[in-house]
C-alpha cells in the first residue's frame, strides 16, 4: 500500500489523516506529497493504522500528536491540560493591548501555559506568573516555557491561594477558567470527553470560578489594573454583571472572529470602588 492509497482509504478527514501520516513518517507536507506513490513500510502503516483508530474513537488529534499550535508556536499538550483553542488567542491579544511597559501579569489556571508563555515571549520586558491547581498541568506548562525559551514564574495552588505571594502588584490578572455549566451535554461529546473535566466545568452554574476571580482580583491588582476573563459565547452579559458587582469600571465584552462574546474585562480603580 502506498502513502496515497492509505490516505484514500482512511475514514478520517483528509487533513487529519495527512497530519497523522506526517507524524508517523516524519515527512514534511511537501515530502509526503512528492513521495505519495511510494510503498509504506509496514511499521509506518501499522503505526498510522493505530493512530487513525484512536482518532476514529474520538481522541483529539492534539493529544495523539502531543502538540497544538497556538499563536504561531507549537505547544506540548496531553490529557492533563486543556487543548488551546484559537479563540483564546483573542484573550492574549487583549492582554498585550493593555500591558504597560515592564508590566506584571498573572495567568491563573494556566493549563498548558499557552497564555502565559505567549505573553512572556511577545513581551520579554514583562514579569509573568502562571499558576494552576494541577501539578501535572504545571509540569506541562513548565516544559512549554523551557522548550520555547519563555521566562515565566510558576506557582501551585487554587486561584489566589498559591505557594507564592499574591499582594497587590499586578497590572493584569488573566484567566480562561472552567466555565461550562455542570451537566452540560457538550461535556460528553466530541473532544471534550477526553479533556480534563476540572479545566472545563466548575461543577456548578458555570460562573462560580468567574465570581471567585472577580472577588479576589481587586486585592491583588495595582491601581488601574485589568482583570480579563475568557468565557462561553452566551455568558457575556452575566460576566459583565459579575465584574460590575465587584467594583470594576469600564467593563467591556470583546467578540471572537465569529462575532460571539468571548472575553470580558474590567479596570480596577480603588477610588471608584
Swiss-Prot record:
An annotated GO BP: methylation
Residues reported in the UniProt entry to bind S-adenosyl-L-methionine: 109-113, 132, 159, 176
One Gene Ontology molecular-function label: nucleic acid binding
Recorded catalytic activity of this chain's protein: L-glutaminyl-[peptide chain release factor] + S-adenosyl-L-methionine = N(5)-methyl-L-glutaminyl-[peptide chain release factor] + S-adenosyl-L-homocysteine + H(+)
Source species, domain of life: Bacteria
Gene: prmC
Keywords: Methyltransferase, S-adenosyl-L-methionine, Transferase
Protein name from the UniProt record: Release factor glutamine methyltransferase
Family from the record: Belongs to the protein N5-glutamine methyltransferase family. PrmC subfamily.
Pfam families for the chain: MTS, PrmC_N
EC number(s) recorded for this UniProt protein: 2.1.1.297
Function comment: Methylates the class 1 translation termination release factors RF1/PrfA and RF2/PrfB on the glutamine residue of the universally conserved GGQ motif.
Residues binding substrate, per UniProt: 176-179
Enzyme class: transferase
InterPro entries in UniProt: DNA_methylase_N6_adenine_CS, HemK-like, N5-glutamine_MTase, PrmC_N, RF_methyltr_PrmC, SAM-dependent_MTases_sf, Small_mtfrase_dom
